[in-house]
Amino acid sequence: MSHELTLQQRLEVQAGPDPLHRAVKEAVAALAQAAIDISDLTCRGALAGITGEAQGRNTDGDIQKDLDVRADQIIRDALSALPIAVLASEEMAELDILNPGAPISVAFDPLDGSSNINTNISVGTIFSIMPTPPDASAAFTQPGSAQLAAGFVVYGPQTSLILTLGQGVDIFTLDRVERVFKLTGSMMQIPADATEFAINTSNRRHWDLPVRAYIDECLMGADGPSGKNFNMRWIGSLVAEAFRILVRGGIFLYPGDARDGYEDGRLRLVYEAHPMAFIIEQAGGGASTGRKRILDIVPGSLHQRVPLIMGSIKNVRRLEDMHTGPNVALEANAPLFGHRGLFRV
């Protein structure tokens, strides 16, 4: 693949003359420029005064780092002059209504995974672009299927922008010399079936039975019903996990569990689950709570949390079957289902 096609050129071709699409183009271009500035900050780390120390908590109760605040402001500044009706940031309690008559509204998580800064693990920016309804304040009470565009940026060994405009998924890599994003992956397709899973297994005792059953099945490997050996991955960075799935498949799970405050998972529907689900589905994968398609969910509140299971479509469907089929009746303590339970033939 030639790496000479820039993000700006790609957006120009896809936008055409349509005013709505051109508004999306302008927003994505501005978000990409903001991402370059955020990438500069994350690359410099302590040299830019970034320590990773907590600066308090955001309105949702999560620890807020200095870089969260700085990234939030960089994105706001980049979008402020554009025809955008509403901004919604994970770092802010309320909507920021800019221009109610504008055609699009943008939600974003300015720095996902900022708790990883001190350990030099990839962090990222996630965004979602919605059409503005007649009542602009209802912009983010639409199902995820209404999204016009979604993307995320990974600030890692490379800075990569992953984007869908509803016509497949492209990957752009930042050329640090020219300071532009260039196309490096087009029409990405997630393998339908894969042998990697990502979940924080330290929480196993808190999981619902279907999640436990699925992971136990993976751990049985070739001796279990799947007949395949699995590898486990857990980075603790949503953007890094999603990028890996786009490139080589697998399944990511951040389920709800029995702990206080975790019943509905921890990831935000508007800022994280909706955009990730749109991207993953556009690349041929699946995204679900285990019981419901993520893109069908209508937010009940701006900062609503949901369980998120995403990745290779066959893996996701298998876990959905465990939530809705007869497997939910399995004994909770069947040891890896190796000698009893419905998984053994």
UniProtKB/Swiss-Prot annotation:
Annotated Gene Ontology cellular component terms: cytosol
InterPro entries linked: FBPase_C_dom, FBPase_class-1, FBPase_N, FBPtase, Fructose_bisphosphatase_AS
Disulfide bonds: none
Pathway recorded for this protein: Carbohydrate biosynthesis; gluconeogenesis
Keyword Magnesium attributed: yes
Amino acids binding substrate: 112-115, 200
Cofactor mode of binding and number, as noted: Binds 2 magnesium ions per subunit.
Annotated positions binding Mg(2+) 1: 90, 109, 111
Binding, Mg(2+) 2: 109, 112, 272
Localization (cell): Cytoplasm
Matches recorded under PROSITE patterns: FBPASE
Cofactors (names): Mg(2+)
Entries under Gene3D superfamilies matching the protein: 3.40.190.80, Fructose-1,6-Bisphosphatase, subunit A, domain 1
Keyword set includes Lipoprotein: no
Major localization class: cytoplasm
Reaction(s) the record says it catalyses: beta-D-fructose 1,6-bisphosphate + H2O = beta-D-fructose 6-phosphate + phosphate
Keywords: Carbohydrate metabolism, Cytoplasm, Hydrolase, Magnesium, Metal-binding, Plasmid
Signal peptide: none
Molecular-function GO terms, alphabetical: fructose 1,6-bisphosphate 1-phosphatase activity; magnesium ion binding
EC number(s) stated in the UniProt entry for this protein: 3.1.3.11
GO BP annotation list: fructose 1,6-bisphosphate metabolic process; fructose 6-phosphate metabolic process; fructose metabolic process; gluconeogenesis; sucrose biosynthetic process
NCBIfam families reported in the protein's UniProt record: PRK09293.1-3, PRK09293.1-4
Oligomeric form and interacting partners: Homotetramer.
PANTHER family reported in the protein's UniProt record: FRUCTOSE-1,6-BISPHOSPHATASE-RELATED, SEDOHEPTULOSE-1,7-BISPHOSPHATASE, CHLOROPLASTIC
Family: Belongs to the FBPase class 1 family.
Name the record gives this protein: Fructose-1,6-bisphosphatase class 1 2
The species this protein was found in: Nitrobacter hamburgensis (strain DSM 10229 / NCIMB 13809 / X14)
